[in-house]
């Protein structure tokens, strides 16, 4: 029980083991595979450090690639499986998908961001990312951009529909905890799915690496959701207004989980937003949410032992410490449930329902009944407080879980280890709402 609680709800304690540079390497790895696929073997060789280029000739790269495609068929795409630092080197494991199967590759980079190794990896039994059927790459393009807020420069991905002008654009905001730009949880990448699904229907998006992922060292003292989320979200909205071809009057923001909870606050800070989308967004105090989640996970575990109940009671008692609304004599950087007291005070004094009531922008609230992290109790609060407002639309999906994928049951954390895609029905509904159809 304790391990599950920390995994899901300590939110910001996880320290990033790599810096901003590792995300630049994702783009380089993509480009490397594109060159191989386009038979630009000489260009592919330039990705390697000069000290190893003589050992990795264009002819050898051609032979390797032709052997692989002869066995697995034409190349389709490559997705990041994992990345880490090893001393002065960075490694990126990519899962390359071909028409007849997949093959993991390890790309080793030095500090100069040059390849010093390119290896075939053994296939893992773990699930890998599932490219959704609606992700038709002939309909959209992607490129690297940067979200800049004060001194921070975060790697981002701009996804735009091909051949379109005056298109709407959506800023995608993560949930709690350190997160990459895809919102990766196990083999699932909900923000990447959303970007692909929206772009295939003519709507652009910006998604970016969360600051707590790449600048974890800045989050050791006192901070709030301002530093964690809202500053960068507002900066991403400003960036959206500069994108060529984007309709500056059709800028939206989609917040997932904590991002959805904070979406009304962000909208108040960014009046240029046409509307906001709250996906699986808490409406209650986080302490109430965490208590409900832990009770659910305890019941789902079917633990009937006395020790299990004692442990649950201890966790619930500990969670009560997160209800503080003032610091009093407490220092802002005092740690409560793995987060500074300043964080809890700020979040507990924020009322997303009342903030949303003051907005004139359009609001879409979506909730899945198979979500065990943010439940229908939250949606019912949104519905009670906002359903009578003309600028608000609310939708419930009987099958969708917290990662916005269709599931046959509510499930537990183990569900997140299985590859699934964001519901196409949900994406189509978002598209229809944005386009006003």
Residue spans for each PLM region:
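Short solvent-exposed beta->alpha transition segments
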Residues: 26-27, 42-87
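N-terminal cap/lid segment of alpha/beta-hydrolase-fold proteins
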Residues: 125-165
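Short beta-strand element of the alpha/beta-hydrolase
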Residues: 166-175
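Alpha/beta-hydrolase active-site loop
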Residues: 223-244
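Primarily recognizes the serine-hydrolase "nucleophile elbow" in alpha/beta-hydrolase
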Residues: 239-297
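Accessory cap/linker subdomain of secreted extracellular hydrolases
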Residues: 277-358
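Short beta-strand/loop motif that positions the catalytic acidic residue
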Residues: 359, 365-367
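Catalytic active-site module of serine/aspartate enzymes centered on a nucleophile-bearing elbow/loop
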Residues: 400-403, 409-437
């Amino acid at each position: 029980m304790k391990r599950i609680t920390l995994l899901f709800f300590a939110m910001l304690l996880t320290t990033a083991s790599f810096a901003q540079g590792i995300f630049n390497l994702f783009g380089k790895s993509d480009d490397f595979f594109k060159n191989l696929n386009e038979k630009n073997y000489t260009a592919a060789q330039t990705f390697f450090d000069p000290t190893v280029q003589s050992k990795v000739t264009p002819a050898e790269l051609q032979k390797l690639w032709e052997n692989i495609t002869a066995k697995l068929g034409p190349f389709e795409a490559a997705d990041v499986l994992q990345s880490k630092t090893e001393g002065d080197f960075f490694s990126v494991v990519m899962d390359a998908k071909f028409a007849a199967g997949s093959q993991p590759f390890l790309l080793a980079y030095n500090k100069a961001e040059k390849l010093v190794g390119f290896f075939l990896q053994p296939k893992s039994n773990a699930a890998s990312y599932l490219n959704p059927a609606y992700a038709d790459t002939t309909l959209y393009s992607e490129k690297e951009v940067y979200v800049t807020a004060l001194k921070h420069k975060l790697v981002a991905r701009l996804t735009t529909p091909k051949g379109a002008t005056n298109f709407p654009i959506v800023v995608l905001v993560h949930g709690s905890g350190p997160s990459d730009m895809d919102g990766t949880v196990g083999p699932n990448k909900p923000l990447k799915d959303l970007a692909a699904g929206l772009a295939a229907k003519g709507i652009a998006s910006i998604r970016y690496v969360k600051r707590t992922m790449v600048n974890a060292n800045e989050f050791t003292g006192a901070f709030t959701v301002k530093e964690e989320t809202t500053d960068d979200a507002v900066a991403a909205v400003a960036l959206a207004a500069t994108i060529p071809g984007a309709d500056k009057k059709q800028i939206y923001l989609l917040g997932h989980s904590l991002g959805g909870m904070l979406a009304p606050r962000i909208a108040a800070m960014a009046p240029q937003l046409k509307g906001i989308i709250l996906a699986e967004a808490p409406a209650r105090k986080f302490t109430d949410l965490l208590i409900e989640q832990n009770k659910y996970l305890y019941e789902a575990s079917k633990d009937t032992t006395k020790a299990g109940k004692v442990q649950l009671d201890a966790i619930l008692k500990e969670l009560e410490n997160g209800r503080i609304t003032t610091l009093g004599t407490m220092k802002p950087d005092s740690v409560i449930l793995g987060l500074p007291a300043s964080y809890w005070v700020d979040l507990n004094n924020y009322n997303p329902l009342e903030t949303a009531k003051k907005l004139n922008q359009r609001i879409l609230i979506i909730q899945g009944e198979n979500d065990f992290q943010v439940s229908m109790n939250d949606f019912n609060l949104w519905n009670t407080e906002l359903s009578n407002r003309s600028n608000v639309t609310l939708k419930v999906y009987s099958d969708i879980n917290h990662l916005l994928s269709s599931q046959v049951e509510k499930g537990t954390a183990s569900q997140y280890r299985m590859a699934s895609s964001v519901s196409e029905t949900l994406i189509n509904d978002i598209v229809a709402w944005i386009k006003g159809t």
